[in-house]
Structures are given as C-alpha cells and as structure tokens.
Amino acid sequence: MILEEATLNKLRVNSPPGGWFPALQDLYLCITEFNLRCADLFLSPRLKRIRIYVMWLWDTPPPPDFLQNLASIISALSTSSLEQMSVHPNNQAIPWVLFEDIFSSIVLRCGPPFTEYDSPVPLSNAALNHLIHLPHLHTWRIHGPPPTYPTSSLPLVFPPLRELTLGEGAVRGWFPLLRCLEGGTSTTQGVTPLSRAKESLKVLRVEDMSGLNVDPSSVSTIQCFRNLVDLRVRVHCPSRDERGQCNFKLNNDDIAELAMALTQLQSLVLGYPCFKNTCLTTIACLLPISVHCSKLRKLKIHLNTTNIVDDLRNILEDPQFQQLRSLPKCPLTYLGVYRTPLRLDESDLETVAKGIVDIFPSLTDFDGFEESWIELSRQITDLREGSE
C-alpha cells in the first residue's frame, strides 16, 4: 500500500479515536526524513511486534529536528502489549549513539510480556538493566557492552534466554559479567543469577571480527550453558596477505572438555579455519567430539594437519576409539575445514579418509578449499558408497 502526501494529510485530520489501525499487531516501520512526520499514523495500542528501520541517506549525522521528531514518534508507541522489537539504522557511518536516549526510552517502558530485542543501537545502563530483569525475555541480540555495576550490586537475576547473540563489541564486556553472575549467589542457597539461563539457553552466537581469541578463558564461560544445541563463534583470523597470528588458541584437551560439557550440541562452529596451520588442535580432537556429542550434525574447527597421518595412527590406539564401536554413531554430516592447508601424497589419502570415516561414519559434506581436501572428500564418498 502506497499513500501519497495528500492522502496522509487527510488521514491525520480525520483520524478516529484509537487511530486508523487499532487492531494492528505487527508493524514494519521504515523511517526516513520524508515520512517521519506521518509515521505515527500507523501506530496501534495493540502492537506486539515492531521492526524499526531508520534510513538516513546522507554522510552527515541527522540534524536535531530529525532526532526530535523520531523521539516524538517513539514516545507515542504503546508498549503495553509489546513482545518483540528490532531497531536497525541503515547507515554504518551514522554515530549510533545519537539514538541511544530515544530507543532506551522505549525499552524502559517494556513490561513482562516482552520476549525479544535486537538492535545495534547502544542502550543506557538503565535500559540494559531493565532488559536483564524482564522475566520472559528469551531472545536477545546484543551489540554493545553490558551495564556497569559496582562489584557489590550485581543483578540477582538474569532472563531465561533461549537465544543469545553477542555482536561486535559485546563479547569482551559480557563474558566477564556472565562469569561474575555464575559465581554470584542469590537469596536461594546454591542458585546463582545465571541458573535459569544455564538451563534454558539453546543458541549462542558470538560474532566478533576484531581479533577475539578463541581460548580456554572464553570457552570456559560458554561451557556452563550445558543445554546448547547451536554454538557459533565467528571470529577473524588474518588472511594470507595479512600479518598476525591465528586466533584459535584451544588445544585437544580443551576441545575434549568442551565436548564433555556440551553434549546436546547439534551444530558447533569454532571460528573459520585459516591457512596458517599453527593451531594446537589436531585431528585427534575429533575423537572426543564424536564420543560425547552424539547429536552433532555440523562442525567447523581449526585443525593442524602437519602430522595428520601419525595423529590418525595414534587415534587407532586410543581407548576412546574402541569405545566408539559400542556407541551410537555420531550423526555428523558436515565438516568444515575451509582454508586449512593439507599436503598428502596419494598413498596417505586413503589412510586419512578411512580414519575420518571411522570417527564420523555419516559424513557426507567435507568443506575444504585445498585440492587435497577435495580429493579426500572424494575418497570418503567412495568409502561410504562401498560400505552401503
């Protein structure tokens, strides 16, 4: 539906009590400098879900009158029934802090029905703390630092989230806070502020392309969420033309500990494997994943392939490998190794292929860029087809 300016003026003049859309529950509101003054015509007292897209087409920040008009629209938004809200500016060049007070004001008016919030716009301490105390919040995509608390006054509760995304700039602040909340105690003996979230959280996404290390400290924070089914850690390793070290700092024992803690995983993405081949994890780390993560279907992980043939021979002597035969086979179908180097002569390809199939019998999709990985994938396909 496209409404011309003259029509919008008539709608405003003749607006009935309760507005033109009193029963509207879902609203996608694209705000520009051209339609800002009529955006309130589409607000409803019964809104449950709203997506706000702030479109600013210029390189310079929006002027005060734009922000004032936007604040007026937001203040008119009813939140009594609001359950879900997302707010996204279109222009990366805009200082998003300009919108902090405007959208913090609406968050502070959200009540117990509120369940989902997604926005890169920073929020005030008060607004963040308000979200933390909402009893039914189950989906939260965070793009900024957490609220600041004096050590003696950490929150005694945390929402029972099912899905948490920590975007760019959020991880370094939120991980320490989560560790503090897990270590704190509430009025009930043995219950921490994080107790409900530890049971409820199913999806955790960590998206930080600014050099976050995937190391034992960061993984230890994650391991308390033992019912996770989807864990994605998206970090950046330097490309072949860039200086810097691989950001994947886990070893085989760290992976084994993670696998034992997160046995419900169906998808595990630990960064995007890079070309450096300097990580401490070898193909041996796949064994505890296969043993303990009996529901896993997708895996992306850094592997050091320098001694891959010898590492596989050692796996064959590992008691855990013998244990695999008595366990339900791991349903993993996808293994992503991406830019990981692999240098194998033809005689070793079949050895490695057999070893991988022994660990992941259901593997069908092997994602590696090197020619040896592509050939290895063919060998694995042939082995699987030959056993059927």
Explain the meaning of each model-derived region:
Residues 1-388:
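Leucine-rich repeat
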